[in-house]
Amino acid sequence: MAGNESALSRAIEAETVNRVELYAAALIPNRLSGAPEEVIQEVTARQSLNWNPSSPISARTLTIAAENRLERIDEAILICSPPSIRSRASMIPLSDVEIMINDNIKGWFFLVKELAAIFTARKRGTLALVFPDISSSGKDDNADVLGPSALASFRALTQGLLAAAHSEPYITVGFSHTDAGNETAFAAYIFKILDEISGKAKGKMFKFGKFSFFK
């Protein structure tokens, strides 16, 4: 699994621990200005793999390291839940713009390319892309200047991959939720679907919300 350090990624990692004996995780800490250094260090220390999203070489190194750790990659879960930047446009530090683009937009394209190459060569595998459909406040956050842009890019990437999924030898699925604060249930829902996944699910978008358990 790879993704932003967030309530969503923590819930998915916790569910992963309960379901598998061995996994590999690369989490992106919030490196925006004002983020507590101790939190960045804590996230970096507990992840099993290092990843610099701005580097295509790092994406390849990450997948090689994951294969060495796990022997092979059967399933990859990518989680985009970018941090918020609540600031007047004129006051946003240029460094934060660069970090947001590198960590929350550009890196996903590099990593998806590497994973797709692995799954294509093996002619099997599951690529799951996960994102929230709303902000962490539970409604669209108009005060967040850059977070929604990063999320929109990941959503568009997901939609493109799902549209092309039927021509690929591996399975690509998407997951989104509109139930902020219920990340634990969403994580359980994701793994319930993945546990039962088949080729018929190729290109499908699974949406978690109030009525998901009745689908």
What is each PLM-predicted segment?
Residues 1-35:
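Canonical Rossmann dinucleotide-binding motif of NAD(H)/NADP(H)-dependent dehydrogenases/reductases
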Residues 46-71, 78-103:
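Conserved mid-core segment of classical short-chain dehydrogenase/reductases
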Residues 59, 73, 107-112, 183-186, ...:
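Conserved internal alpha-helix within the Rossmann fold of NAD(P)-dependent oxidoreductases
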Residues 81-111, 117-166, 176-179:
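Catalytic loop of short-chain dehydrogenase/reductase
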